[in-house]
Design a protein with these regions (language model features):
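Charged, gly/pro-rich active-site loop segments
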Residues: 2, 82-145
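A short mixed-secondary-structure module that forms the rim of ligand-binding clefts
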Residues: 39-77
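Onset of an N-terminal alpha helix
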Residues: 3-11, 15
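Hydrophobic/aromatic beta-strand elements that line small-molecule binding cavities or substrate pockets
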Residues: 36-40, 85-87
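Short, positively charged
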Residues: 1-5, 60-61
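A short, Trp-centered hydrophobic/proline-enriched beta-strand micro-motif
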Residues: 12-27, 68-72
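Short, surface-exposed beta-edge/turn micro-motifs
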Residues: 17-19, 46-48, 65-68, 117-120, ...
C-alpha cells in the first residue's frame, strides 16, 4: 500500500473515531500521552488539527520538542494508524475557526473538562511518517510523506 493510500485509510478512520492518542515529550524527556479530538481539513490532507489552551502542559512540551506521535484506532481494533510528525502551535483566527468547525460537536467534552481560561490555540501536526496496522488481517503498511 502506498503512502497516499494509507493516508486515505487514515482519513476514513478519523471520520469514524474523531479521537486519537496524542504523544509529546516533556521537558524531562518522558513521553506524555493524552486523548484528543482531532480533525483534518480537506485543503491540508497531510496535517492533523486539534485545539488546546496556550497554558496547557502539551503546549509547554511542544515549546521544547515539537516531535510528536499520534495513534488512532477503530473500537474493533481491526485498524490502527500510527503517525509521527512535527507539531506547530498556531494562533490564527481564521484557521482556529476552520478547525473548531471541523471538530464540531466532538469538542463538548473538551469544554466541560477544560474550563480554564486562556488563549485557545491550534495544534497543527505535519504528518511525516504513517503506518497502518490491520491485526485481524495480519497486515502492516508504512509510508513517508
Amino acid at each position: 500500500m502506498k503512502a497516499h493510500e494509507i493516508l486515505d485509510s487514515f482519513h476514513s478512520l478519523l471520520e469514524d473515531v474523531r479521537r486519537g492518542l496524542f504523544i509529546t515529550i516533556d521537558s524531562e524527556g518522558y513521553p506524555q500521552a493524552r486523548w484528543m479530538v482531532a480533525a483534518s481539513l480537506n485543503e491540508q490532507p497531510d496535517y492533523i488539527y486539534s485545539v488546546s489552551f496556550d497554558s496547557s502542559n502539551k503546549i509547554r512540551d511542544l515549546a521544547t520538542n515539537n516531535k510528536v506521535a499520534w495513534s488512532f484506532q477503530l473500537p474493533s481494533l481491526n485498524e490502527i494508524v500510527y503517525i509521527q510528525g512535527e507539531a506547530s502551535v498556531l494562533d490564527n483566527p481564521q484557521l482556529k475557526a476552520e478547525v473548531i468547525e471541523a471538530l464540531g460537536p466532538n469538542l463538548a467534552h473538551f469544554w466541560r473538562v477544560r474550563p480554564e481560561h486562556g488563549q485557545l490555540v491550534v495544534i497543527e501536526t505535519a504528518i511525516e511518517k504513517i503506518r497502518l496496522q490491520q491485526p485481524l488481517a495480519n497486515a502492516n503498511s508504512a509510508g513517508k510523506l
